[in-house]
Design a protein with these regions (language model features):
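Acidic/histidine-enriched alpha-helical segments
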Residues: 238-240, 247, 309-325, 525, ...
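Sec-dependent signal peptide recognition
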Residues: 2-9
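C-terminal outer-membrane beta-barrel translocator/porin domains of Gram-negative envelope proteins
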Residues: 397, 409-423, 448, 537-538, ...
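Gram-negative/organellar outer-membrane beta-barrel architecture
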Residues: 367, 372, 386-551, 558, ...
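Patatin-like phospholipase
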Residues: 19-64, 72-385, 389-390, 405-406
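Hydrophobic h-region of N-terminal signal peptides that target proteins for export
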Residues: 9-18
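Solvent-exposed coil/turn segments that connect beta secondary-structure elements
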Residues: 79, 88, 169-172, 182-184, ...
Length: 728
């Protein structure tokens, strides 16, 4: 590994044995060993390109981590240009971050991520347990499955167009393991499984992680394969400056780097030719520098031309060599005659087989299959889903391996909420959502929410599908809540009320797809508004029972739960109150919220949101139903400064991505600007239109979005605020 990088970047540097019987060669055979190094490993493509241009044959190839990936792709018969095209088309940022895309989540998992936007979860399946890695490996696994699919039925990696090996670290025996057979995609995943970052690969009761820990430059493996002349490609990163200040994490990272560097020196000592690629100006996460890295590898090979050119073949010999390699390449994938799912319970496997039955007798389209399997992970049950071909009873079938989360259910989604719109009275709460699966029936869910701090809340819902193959469901639920209702005039807090309620209800609904849902329900219980501090005459102190029927429609086509860049969302609620404390009579109520986001350039987008609510002219509702004031509700105004029974609020804004955090810390950082204008009806100041402009930074952290900004509005309203938690 490389000096001068943090422990996280070091981990990326890890990214990258039996004697085989070689084919008969009238010449000295050549073996290539490729070192691990995260994005630095892309330089191997340049080395391969130079060697092919100069007719240097590669009879054997072995690699570790990223070297294993590049070597494995090349071993399937792709030429360096094809390898370059493949790796250049990978969304490395998405692969590294590892989260299932928001658009691919089921509707209920979209609700989870929207309401609990922290970027991590844990489980209680065997006590408190976290995932085996920051990244489940699903996205990278699909890439490897696609590469390896034509070679699924090979018995040995010796039968690939170029014989291949890759190195992994096996944890149960604490030793190096060399993959030479089995599913190629599993082997590539294992050699790249950075400890703590990617979830380990479990095969046949063994646990595999990145091979760079024990053998980052496997020249010994190439020798055992039968190579006469061994070429090692060493990725020379930046060295540690003795004057560089080190944190405890840096010391740990550099210590691991020293251990791995020892394996690299051992590998170089066993090579006949060493190609050392100068990559000091790059880092193990420099995936956006594909062309520069490839060029560096090419230049390093050129610098070693005097050692390499003696292995050059004549044009005739080279064409014969390519023809032999091409003859071992499998050009097409057999059409599967059945679909088989494993890794989960028989009942769940049966559902997945029915869901994927369309592939029975149909040619595999890897992109469409990848999309379907990603949507399966979006159900929340599986950490990763992969595929390969299997043979049974003389027929070729599509095997789907669904890896259930080892730590869940129940799944725990934590939340941390900070509202600093009044820096003298910061509101703070912590909580979590607990989701239990298959309670009483397959696919049934028990969802429990708890929150404590400035607000105390407990809620429970039992989601019961009426059929495994339709969207109809029933959902009994109950909630108890004790929340602050602080009332302001500009920056001055006039009063603090508590809104306490306890309700139970039943919904009947239909989930159309992963984007929208319709519910009909009835809810009844108790509601109280009680003043704690300040002016007790601002709103009525009421207490009593409430009951209402409701219709709710939700649509979510956004591309992100935290800071969307594209898509639309709509939430519409219609309630009819039979009773409510302080209300003179029964009355209807409706409120809606609409969002639209449109990207303009890769780092820029605009958005428009609209909200509105009405009681259709009924004023005797007890406490007014809606409030305006506070972040994203007229940000320059004090919290709940305006009470009303009818309003509208329009917002238009601009988002510009300023930078991007390392995956372990969060995601994007945006500069956000917006203009808000609204109208509240039925109050003395209703003739004017309250408005403001807001500017701030939105930072996507592991604990959810942090928003820091200020707003200036009409009539002298202005405010500085910060908050952590849901924004849009």
């Amino acid at each position: 590994m490389r000096r001068g990088i943090s422990v996280i970047l070091l981990c990326f540097a890890l990214f990258a044995g039996a004697q085989t019987t070689p084919a008969s060669h009238p010449r000295e055979t050549v073996g290539l060993a490729l070192e691990g190094g995260g994005a630095l490993g892309l330089a191997h493509i340049g080395v391969l390109q130079w060697m092919e241009e100069h007719h240097i044959p590669i009879d054997y190839v072995a690699g570790t981590s990223m070297g294993g990936l590049v070597g494995g792709i090349y071993a399937t018969g792709m030429n360096p240009g094809e390898v370059r095209e493949l790796v250049g088309g990978i969304d490395w940022d998405g692969v590294i971050r590892g989260q299932t895309d928001f658009r691919d989540l089921s509707f209920r998992r979209k609700e989870d991520r929207t309401e609990y936007p922290a970027a991590f979860e844990f489980g209680l399946r065997h006590g408190v347990a976290f995932p085996g890695g920051f990244n489940s490996g699903h996205q990278v696994g699909l890439i490897l499955d696609r590469i390896a699919l034509p070679y699924s039925l090979l018995k040995s990696f010796d039968d690939l167009p170029t014989p291949f090996r890759c190195v992994s670290t096996e944890l149960t025996e604490r030793e190096e393991f060399v993959f030479q057979q089995g599913p190629l995609s599993d082997a590539l995943r294992a050699t790249m499984s950075i400890p703590g970052f990617f979830t380990p690969v479990k095969l046949n009761h063994k646990i595999y992680v990145d091979g760079g820990l024990l053998d980052n430059l496997p020249t010994d493996v190439v020798k055992e394969m039968g190579a006469d002349h061994i070429i090692a490609v060493h990725l020379q990163g930046a060295k540690l400056n003795a004057e560089t200040p080190l944190s405890s994490f840096s010391v740990l990272g550099e210590s691991i780097a020293a251990v791995v560097a020892t394996t690299e020196r051992r590998g170089m000592a066993k090579a006949d030719t060493v190609i050392s690629v100068d990559l000091a100006r790059f880092g193990p996460t420099s995936f956006d520098a594909v062309d520069e890295l490839i060029a560096a590898g090419y230049a390093a090979a050129e610098a070693n031309a005097s050692a390499l050119l003696p292995k050059r073949l004549s044009d005739t010999e080279w064409n014969e060599f390519l023809a032999r390699r091409q003859s071992r390449r499998i050009p097409s994938v057999p059409t599967p005659q059945f679909v088989q799912v494993d890794g989960t319970s028989p009942a769940v496997a049966s559902q997945l087989e029915r869901r994927l039955k369309s592939w029975d007798g149909k040619r595999i389209d890897p992109r469409r299959l990848d999309q379907q399997l990603t949507e399966v992970t979006g159900l929340g049950r599986f950490s990763a889903v992969g595929y390969n071909l299997v043979e049974k009873d003389g027929k070729v079938g599509l095997r789907i391996h669904a890896a259930e989360k080892e730590y869940a259910p129940p799944t725990v989604n934590p939340t941390l909420i900070i509202n600093g719109s009044d820096y003298q009275n910061v509101l703070f709460a912590v909580g979590a959502r607990f989701t239990f699966l298959d309670i009483g029936k397959i696919n049934a869910e028990l969802r429990t929410d708890v929150l404590a701090g400035s607000e105390y809340r407990a809620a429970i819902e039992y989601y019961l599908p009426l059929s495994a193959y339709s969207g109809w469901f029933v959902a009994p639920r109950a909630v108890a809540d004790n929340a602050p209702l602080n009332i302001y005039l500009r920056d001055k807090r006039l009063a603090e009320y508590r809104q306490r309620e306890a309700n139970t209800g039943l919904d009947f609904g239909y989930t159309f797809n992963r984007f929208n849902e319709l519910r009909f329900g009835y809810e009844f219980g108790w509601l109280q508004y009680d003043p704690d501090l300040g002016d007790k005459s601002l709103i009525r102190a009421v207490s009593g029972k409430q009951s209402f029927s409701r219709v709710r429609y939700s649509l979510n086509h956004l591309d992100d739960a935290i800071v969307p860049r594209a898509g639309v969302a709509l939430n519409a609620n219609i309630n009819f109150y039979d009773s409510r404390p302080g209300a003179a009579d029964q009355f209807p109520e409706m409120d809606t919220h609409f969002q639209f986001f449109q990207p303009l350039r890769p780092n820029d987008s605009v958005f428009f949101t609209g909200s509105g609510g009405t009681t259709f002219g009924y004023s005797g509702t007890g406490v007014p139903m809606f409030t305006l004031g506070g972040p994203f509700r007229l940000s320059a105004y004090g919290n709940n400064e305006i009470f009303t029974n009818q309003y509208f609020l329009l917002q238009a804004g601009y988002l510009h991505q300023v930078t991007q955090l390392p995956p372990i810390l969060g995601n994007h950082v945006y500069l956000a600007g917006s203009y808000e204008i609204g109208k509240a009806y039925g109050i003395a100041r209703s003739q004017r239109l309250p408005m403001d402009g807001t500017l701030g930074l939105v930072i996507q952290t592991l604990f959810g979005p942090a928003y820091i900004g200020g707003s200036y509005g009409d009539s002298g309203h202005h405010k500085f605020f910060f908050q952590l938690g849901k924004i849009f």
